[in-house]
């Protein structure tokens, strides 16, 4: 499974989205998928756990959609 698709699955699970077609590469977690601040924290924590990375606070604020998350993970994955 491609990284983008894996991240979309994580987003769907964390945000309880049953219609995965809503989760596009550029759909904003907050504006388009209705995530709140707690959702974002939990999403980042799940990505950190799944991909064995640490995402500093200043970088977390830059991850606004699936494409941002995939780019960050590809650049920082061990």
Swiss-Prot record:
Organism lineage: Bacteria, Pseudomonadati, Spirochaetota, Spirochaetia, Brachyspirales
Entry keyword set: Cytolysis, Fatty acid biosynthesis, Fatty acid metabolism, Hemolysis, Lipid biosynthesis, Lipid metabolism, Phosphopantetheine, Phosphoprotein, Secreted, Toxin, Virulence
Listed PANTHER family: ACYL CARRIER PROTEIN, CARRIER DOMAIN-CONTAINING PROTEIN
InterPro entries: ACP, ACP-like_sf, PP-bd_ACP, Ppantetheine_attach_site
Post-translational changes noted in the entry: 4'-phosphopantetheine is transferred from CoA to a specific serine of apo-ACP by AcpS. This modification is essential for activity because fatty acids are bound in thioester linkage to the sulfhydryl of the prosthetic group.
Chain ranges passing through the membrane: none
Pfam short name (any one): PP-binding
Domain Carrier as annotated: residue spans: 1-77
Protein name: Acyl carrier protein
């Amino acid at each position: 499974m491609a990284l983008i698709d894996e991240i979309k699955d994580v987003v769907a699970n964390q945000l309880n989205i049953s219609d995965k077609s809503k989760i596009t590469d550029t759909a904003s977690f907050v504006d388009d998928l209705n995530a709140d601040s707690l959702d974002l924290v939990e999403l980042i924590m799940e990505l950190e756990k799944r991909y064995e990375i640490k995402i500093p606070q200043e970088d977390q604020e830059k991850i606004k959609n699936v494409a941002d998350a995939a780019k960050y993970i590809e650049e920082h994955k061990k």
